[in-house]
Amino acid sequence: MKKRLTVLCAALALALAACGGTAGESAPPAASATPSPAVLPVTVKYGISNSWDALMPYNSVSGSNYARMVYDKIYDRLVYVHADGTLSPRAAKSWESADGGYAIVFHLDERSAFHDGTPVTAEHWARTFFLMTDPACPTLGRGNFAGLVGTDEDGCRLEGEPFGAEAADPYTFKLTFQDPVVPEDFLLEKNREFYVLPTHRLEGVDPAEIMEQALWLDPIGSGPCKFVSELPGSQIQLAANPKYPLGAPGFDYLVITVMDKANLLTALIAGDLDYYAIGGSVSAEDADVARSHGLEVLPGAVPNTFYELMLNNETLPDARLRRAVELALDKELLCLQSSQGLGQVTGSYVVPTSVYAPQEKTAAIRDTEEAEALLAKAGYDGRTFTLACTSSRAGLAALMQQNLAEAGIRVEIETVDSATLFAGMSDGIYDMAIASHTPNALPLWFVESRFTEGNNLFHVADLSPYQALISAVRTERDQPARQALVEELDNLLAQERPFIPLWFSTALHVQSPTVTGIDYPSASFSNENVWDWVKR
């Protein structure tokens, strides 16, 4: 058949030539008798429950993790942060401490390039920091730059002073700080805030007008995906960057669609989505639904939520009273009710998987007799305390109320929204409150911001013992010495109990039925390894 077709094509060509073609003219190529089927592009359908509010990463009003998930694809960051707090190269292939701990030197990947083909250099990074700290530039989140040499407490660059972001050579980016820093701590805390901008396209632009540039409607980054199009607040289409240094994503397009959170799992089951943010997280109840439809559900490798009982140290002024509250609580029962078997009770704020986790400390076991004895020593007069909670934790609060009553501590519950809860604790309106937070591996992740004059959230009368230890931990660069200081701080907290650590819980992640290579737990750091994703 193939031979016959060849002969027919040759005969047709001769016939056409005989119909008067002039010398030097060439006949058009013969059309294929059976055209190849078009190869359809491979598209990953990605669901997200909240929209991004800007495509310029330093102009996000919300500063939300949902916006960061979009920036993470278009723009590049210095490193990739894993769920356990370890770091992998991204724009920086290596880094080290310098100048006695006052600086960090980043060695950039020479293969990095913006989507317009321009190589990314240290000058782009330095210029990004220079522009974003200009007092005239309406940078949102500028406080993240505070602490660099040559900036004030708001992160604004000070005119006439040396600035702590410089290009030491074309591929060496150096940051210099006002106080000593540990590179890994800095990156764990700040990596998701910093992106390199195509500053070669901002030459001559007035800093006051940077956020108004048309560039941010059709942004150019150096990340693993390229911007294609956007329906603001609804959908964004990205194309894989085949030249991304860490590898080309195993798809052609990534389409991120905003939909109601309640519909994400349903859409995944129906095949309308391949994956959803953040990390395919699912409740224990919905995990059963996912499994019943043949989807695999796996627990995360590290805790993703920390629960605490906030205490007002002004209305609970005696440490013995605060420790009595802890001993009255049945943490195991409370944890089981809240996390449905995915929690671990704790006596510390330090994440149990962190290298700084206390090795021998265990959570206080419930002891109502000891609680009653401490109450007597503290002179508790039977007053009623207010316990604030959100509506989703009303059942948990009721169980706590029962626990405390069994030890003789009176509590009344006030159900409020989250903003009112934190404002009420800050203003000293409530005596206790149930709260949760997203932890990380930093040794000061929870305490550093809560024991300051400006944010004395627990109304501690004397902050100096805490501040002295926090400062010592922050500036100590020797690992064993630092670990000893963290333990000393943790022991002080256990003795004084300005707040009560309750438990850490782990998330469940629905695995994509169509995409492999997803690092689900690390999405909690607002980064996703899309260069490893392959749609099958």
Labelled PLM ranges:
Residues 509-536:
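Long beta-strand-rich cores associated with HINT superfamily self-processing modules
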